[in-house]
Amino acid sequence: MENLEFMKKFRPEELCIKEFKYWIVCARKKQVTLGDTIIALKRETPNMSDMTKEEAAELVEVTKWYENTCKEKLGAIKFNYIAMMMHDFFIHYHVFPRYDKKINLFDMEWEDRNPLNYFGSVEDTEDDILLKIINYMK
């Protein structure tokens, strides 16, 4: 993954939760809901139709791992996947676990406020909290 803007914005090497052969799962700097991630293809291509059969098959495994991890460790009940690719022209998903109750973790209370604007005014999550989330989910 060599897209410099993506690297600067999402810091995948630093915020990596799990790496697969074709995909990388990274914590989002803005934790709208606990466990928000970016799931990104590790090569640059702007079109979903350019995904190979192997990459598509592995994406199923990636999402199974991610959803099971969030359910078991964080108490998530469902997930929202967004793949707009309006600014970053390569295949990646913003994934938001959803919750039906408040979660107390890392000396913080996390509440799913049924976010309608996932990219709105949420502040960046502090790096030490992001690292705790990453280590907890590994």
Question: Each PLM stretch: what is its role?
Answer:
Residues M1-K138:
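HIT superfamily nucleotide-processing domains
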